[in-house]
């Protein structure tokens, strides 16, 4: 619903200006998930193995792009998808070193897949972007001890994540879905300016 009006914000309230160099719907589609790529930039380091669950979705594509920038040529970005369409989409973008469809796979099967792809090292960072329930154990099992799991998905159950990790003796650090980090709005809009392929896909899907 489009309106003309005024918003009264608390002093601590966050807001972002719509930029002049892109359509409003395109900007809003990116701002909706702006925290994910900005947090990815903080979490990922050169040479790491990074697993992104839901890599072909809106937040997943942005995270894959940022993760590859951060891990460089010696790191590895593994994109995990659920549908044929999202699998092909992220493959075409070329941000991931490996793309695998895990639709119908159990967490243990995904663990074995990631183990094979990383030579047994597992992921330093796992980012869950898929907005469906019961992905907690998949993310935990992909990640090495002392690694980081970032649950960006709002479908995450804290109970399942915490008790599941404890139950299998996994010493991972878990970040639960904080979609805000300083400068996240401009950071994410800049990704669309930097990457023409990403901007084209976002325009076609969301704008």
Region spans (language model):
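NAD(P)H dinucleotide-binding glycine-rich loop of Rossmann-like/cofactor-binding domains
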Residues: 1-49
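Glycine-rich helix-loop-beta junction characteristic of Rossmann-like nucleotide cofactor-binding loops
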Residues: 40-46, 118-120, 141
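C-terminal capping/lid region of NAD(P)-dependent oxidoreductase domains
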Residues: 120, 189-207
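Glycine-rich phosphate-binding loop and adjacent beta-alpha segment
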Residues: 130-195
């Amino acid at each position: 619903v489009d309106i003309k009006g005024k918003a009264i914000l608390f002093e601590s309230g966050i807001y972002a200006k719509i930029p002049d160099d892109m359509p409003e719907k395109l900007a809003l589609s990116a701002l909706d998930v702006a925290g994910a790529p900005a947090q990815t930039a903080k979490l990922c380091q050169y040479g790491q193995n990074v697993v992104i669950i839901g890599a072909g979705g809106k937040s997943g594509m942005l995270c894959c792009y940022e993760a590859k920038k951060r891990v460089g040529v010696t790191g590895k970005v593994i994109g995990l998808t659920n549908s044929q369409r999202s699998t092909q989409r992220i493959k075409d973008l070329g941000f991931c070193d490996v793309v695998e469809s895990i639709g119908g796979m159990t967490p243990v099967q995904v663990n074995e897949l990631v183990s094979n792809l990383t030579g047994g090292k597992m992921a330093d960072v796992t980012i869950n972007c898929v907005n469906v329930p019961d992905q907690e154990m998949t993310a935990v099992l992909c990640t090495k001890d002392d690694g980081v799991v970032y649950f960006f998905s709002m479908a995450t159950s804290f109970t399942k994540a915490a008790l599941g990790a404890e139950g299998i003796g996994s010493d991972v650090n878990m970040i639960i879905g904080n979609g805000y980090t300083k400068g996240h709005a401009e950071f994410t809009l800049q990704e669309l300016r930097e990457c023409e392929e990403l901007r084209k896909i976002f325009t076609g899907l969301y704008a």
